[in-house]
A protein has these predicted regions:
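Long, charge-rich, low-complexity intrinsically disordered regions
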Residues: 1-7, 107-110
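Short, surface-exposed loop/turn motifs that are enriched in glycine and acidic residues
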Residues: 6-14, 42-43
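Short, charge-rich, low-complexity alpha-helical interaction segments
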Residues: 10-32, 105
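Short acidic/histidine-centered micro-motifs embedded in hydrophobic/aromatic stretches
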Residues: 23, 27, 70-74, 93-96
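Short coil/turn segments at secondary-structure boundaries
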Residues: 35-39, 107-109
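Amphipathic protein-protein interaction modules
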Residues: 38-88
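Long, compositionally biased
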Residues: 85-111
Length: 111
């Protein structure tokens, strides 16, 4: 359930990106929305996984650490390669946090 998933975030439990997306899909209706993450601009329909996770995290008042945990192995990839250039939305969020996130529209609506 949504509450069970939220309780796991930030624990020592390793989250899977796919599980995060599945919980979002089960509990929210998604509408593609453009969003800004630090100096990265994402068009509506672009980087939908990041869009869904950031919107989900905002709706559920997750902090930066909890939000990053929702990215699962992709966040772990970034931690393993601090000088890398992949996963730009994760890397930007690590630098700017919630102050860098801005949506142009509503991406998720609770069912």
């Amino acid at each position: 359930t949504l509450n069970d998933f939220l309780a796991q975030i930030g624990e020592n439990t390793q989250l899977d990106f796919e599980d995060t997306i599945a919980v979002i899909s089960e509990n929210y209706d998604y509408t593609p929305a453009a969003f800004h993450n630090g100096d990265v601009s994402n068009e509506a329909g672009q980087n939908e996984g990041s869009c869904k996770i950031f919107a989900f995290a905002q709706l559920n008042d997750l902090n930066e650490k909890q939000t990053l945990a929702c990215f699962g192995r992709f966040y772990q990839d970034v931690l393993a390669t601090p000088e890398g250039t992949d996963h730009g939305n994760i890397r930007n969020f690590m630098n700017t946090g919630w102050s860098g996130i801005r949506f142009e529209g509503t991406a998720l609506t609770a069912r």
